[in-house]
């Protein structure tokens, strides 16, 4: 068996971290490279030490709760010995206290957290017989239609070296365009699908389009667990998603509403099936090699069935509560009899705290339970158990927040930087992508830079067992990427369209949003909404073109077009645009304005909101991320200028209802209130969600630049 690779210092230079930011008033954070607000109070309280301890331990600390794992105590102890000194003052039993709701988010960890973030067990002294204790449920390989009917075999084991070399040139070197080979509309499901295949030849997956899971080559223990929990019949939508996922195609799926959880159990089933097939194949080949070695046959026998390191599935999630829910699903479908370190996991990832009842339902879902965004945990499957807090190099599945993982990949202490454990990821899952984007998408980009990189060192690696496409740095061509979001944004779209090269193809599922079901038609207010288009040459030029149009056209006529001299709100989605506009108003105009954003201290937030509501502050700047994290109902709004369309269509309705609140209080008249939205043709994706699929192309491409709706 190939032993795991031992890593040393990688000497990676950390990129500029200026964009890794968050809400200082909402969380504990010590900023090192992050931008520091210039005109706002900083909340330097380092607060909850018990939470900090959980952050440390979630990166793999395994020195407690050791019942039933004596065979791995030595390995875990070596891996996490650094934690003993670091946490010796913090790992005392904490007294229980009532749980209260707060939003936890960290963009730059404290020094202690940086210490822990890089602790990855690269000194694995796995018992040579450890693999014999792994998954072996005595199942025979499903041979109903031969190996060619198994998508796992077709995708990972059948592509030849010549084929991969040709595709590598076309896809990675020549950057040939991926043709769209199939578009379908499912009117009854209000859904469309688009299939892209790579240039040249394609991997031909088995033509399985059944609504019965038993028709797919799924391991019996997983299938039985799924049947017990949910039954084997799939809805039409779930069948479409399952077909693409189980055939190892990339998937970009918009699940429309946060209440839709069906897709999660499908990808969890797929991840477990992938792990079990991988481990069982390795075990059976190892047995064959042992038998062959003991025989008198001098002929060489070769099996290439693994990567450089053991982890095969990476699941990125926004919060510990979302991680808790996925782990619960993994346990339910794993078919294991016991779970190691489950109590410890519950203590660190589960919480009963809930947001206030007056918040929107999607907000309560996003921030319920333990909403800390700093974690990274390994999960290992054995014959009868599922082990939580396994060291990364002995894990099968890694669950992490992007920031938690990026702090390991680019730890300030170069000696603690690690990325080899991501070298052999074959299934990448990014769930609740919109929440991750609101935290900081830069961390996702950081992780993507390290996935499937050839390891720096190969200590004790058995190259005779490593697949040639791993050795040849072609793993990216076979890695499956699954991205799930409530609504699509350019950054999320790029994960599959630009950062994935899966030769089995890419499928994008897109909801059909007609004008009747658009967000505009759900507002409930007959208010004047003016959409004004400006010319922009390219997405790169868009920020500059937007700013010039705003200061030259919108701002000079703002007081003239508004029926009121106060109550003017300018909503700005991008923080960088917000800083730009704020600086211009401060240095080049005489506007009496206030500004609130995700960095503003609580005291200033309160003062500014009160001043705006009373009319002392005539104009206010308001950012999308502040609205996401607080969901304020701002009083006193009479005129609303949207510098850009909100990425979340629900925010469009909530912002306009600020004016509805003023109308209800008789502070302004509905006929005199105004909403003006700036957009360019590059905003088509966001525009569709608000005005509908039919209207968006007209607004973006027709001769007229001004459109009014009520």
Curated annotation (Swiss-Prot):
InterPro entries: P-loop_NTPase, UTP25, UTP25_C, UTP25_NTPase-like
Cleavable signal peptide: none
Assigned keywords, A-Z: Nucleus, Ribonucleoprotein, Ribosome biogenesis, rRNA processing
Tree of life domain: Eukaryota
GO MF annotation, one: rRNA binding
Coiled-coil positions: none
Record's compositionally biased regions (Acidic residues): 61-75, 123-143
Keyword rRNA processing: yes
GO cellular component: nucleolus; small-subunit processome
Subcellular localization: Nucleus, Nucleolus
GO biological process, one term: maturation of SSU-rRNA from tricistronic rRNA transcript (SSU-rRNA, 5.8S rRNA, LSU-rRNA)
Region Disordered: start-end pairs: 1-150
Database matches in Pfam families: Utp25_C (PF06862), UTP25_NTPase-like (PF22916)
Protein family (similarity comment): Belongs to the UTP25 family.
PANTHER family documented for this protein: ORF PROTEIN-RELATED (PTHR12933), U3 SMALL NUCLEOLAR RNA-ASSOCIATED PROTEIN 25 HOMOLOG (PTHR12933:SF0)
Subunit details: Component of the ribosomal small subunit (SSU) processome composed of at least 40 protein subunits and snoRNA U3.
Protein name stated in the entry: U3 small nucleolar RNA-associated protein 25
Organism annotation: Candida tropicalis (strain ATCC MYA-3404 / T1) (Yeast)
């Amino acid at each position: 068996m190939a032993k795991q690779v031992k890593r040393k210092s990688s000497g990676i230079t950390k990129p500029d971290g200026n964009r890794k930011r968050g809400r200082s008033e909402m969380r504990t954070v010590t900023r090192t490279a992050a931008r520091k607000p210039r005109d706002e109070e900083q909340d330097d309280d380092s607060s909850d030490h018990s939470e900090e301890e959980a952050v440390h331990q979630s990166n793999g600390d395994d020195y407690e709760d050791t019942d039933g794992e004596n065979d791995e105590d030595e390995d875990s102890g070596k891996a996490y010995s650094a934690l003993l000194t670091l946490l010796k003052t913090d790992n005392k039993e904490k007294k229980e206290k009532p749980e209260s709701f707060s939003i936890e988010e960290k963009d730059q960890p404290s020094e202690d957290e940086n210490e822990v973030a890089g602790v990855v067990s690269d000194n694995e002294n796995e018992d040579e017989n450890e693999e014999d204790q792994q998954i072996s449920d005595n199942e025979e390989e499903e041979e109903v239609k031969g190996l060619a009917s198994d998508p796992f075999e077709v995708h990972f084991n059948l592509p030849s070296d010549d084929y991969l070399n040709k595709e590598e040139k076309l896809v990675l070197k020549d950057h040939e365009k991926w043709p769209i080979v199939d578009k379908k509309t499912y009117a009854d499901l209000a859904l469309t699908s688009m299939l892209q295949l790579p240039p040249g030849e394609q991997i031909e997956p088995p033509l399985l389009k059944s609504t019965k899971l038993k028709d797919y080559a799924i391991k019996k223990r997983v299938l039985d667990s799924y049947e017990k929990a949910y039954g084997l019949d799939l809805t039409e939508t779930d069948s479409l998603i399952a077909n693409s996922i189980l055939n190892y195609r990339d998937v970009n799926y918009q699940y429309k509403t946060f209440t839709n959880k069906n897709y999660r159990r499908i990808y969890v089933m797929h991840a477990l099936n992938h792990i079990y097939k991988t481990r069982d194949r390795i075990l059976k080949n190892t047995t064959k090699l042992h038998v062959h070695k003991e025989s008198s046959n001098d002929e060489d026998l070769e099996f290439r069935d693994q990567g450089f390191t053991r982890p095969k599935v990476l699941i990125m999630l926004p919060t510990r509560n979302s991680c808790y829910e996925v782990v619960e699903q993994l346990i339910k479908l794993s078919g294991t009899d016991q779970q190691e370190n489950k109590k410890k996991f519950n203590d660190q990832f589960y919480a009963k705290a809930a947001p206030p009842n007056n918040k929107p339902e999607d907000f309560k879902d996003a921030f319920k339970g333990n909403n800390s965004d700093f974690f990274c945990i390994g999960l290992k499957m054995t014959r009868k158990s599922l082990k939580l807090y396994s060291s990364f190099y002995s894990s099968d599945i890694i669950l992490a927040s992007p920031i938690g993982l990026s702090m390991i990949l680019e730890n300030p202490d170069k000696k603690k930087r690690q990325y080899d454990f991501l070298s052999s990821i074959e299934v990448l899952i990014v769930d609740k992508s919109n929440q991750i984007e609101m935290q900081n998408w830069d961390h996702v980009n950081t992780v993507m830079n390290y996935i499937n990189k050839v390891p720096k060192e190969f200590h004790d690696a058995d190259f005779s067992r490593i697949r040639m496409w791993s050795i040849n740095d072609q793993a990216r061509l076979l890695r499956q990427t699954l991205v799930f979001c409530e609504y699509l944004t350019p950054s999320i779209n790029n994960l599959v369209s630009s950062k994935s090269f899966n030769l089995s193809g890419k499928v994008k599922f897109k909801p059909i949003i007609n004008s009747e079901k658009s967000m505009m038609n759900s507002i409930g207010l007959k208010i004047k909404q003016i959409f004004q288009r400006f010319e922009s040459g390219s997405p790169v030029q868009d920020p500059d073109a937007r700013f010039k149009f705003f200061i030259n056209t919108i701002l000079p006529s703002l007081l003239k077009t508004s029926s009121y001299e106060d109550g003017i709100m300018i909503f700005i989605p991008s923080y960088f645009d917000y800083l730009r506009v704020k600086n211009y108003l401060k240095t080049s105009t005489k506007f009496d304005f206030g500004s609130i954003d995700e960095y503003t201290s609580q005291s200033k937030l309160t003062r500014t909101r009160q001043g705006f509501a009373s009319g002392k502050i005539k104009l206010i700047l308001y950012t999308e991320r502040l609205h996401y994290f607080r969901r304020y109902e701002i009083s006193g709004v009479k005129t609303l200028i949207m510098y850009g369309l909100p990425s979340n269509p629900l925010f469009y309705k909530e912002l306009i209802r600020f004016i509805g609140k003023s109308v209800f209080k008789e502070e302004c008249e509905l006929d005199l209130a105004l909403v003006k939205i700036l957009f360019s043709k590059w905003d088509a994706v966001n525009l569709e969600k608000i005005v509908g699929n039919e209207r968006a192309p007209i607004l973006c491409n027709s001769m007229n630049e001004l459109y009014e709706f009520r």
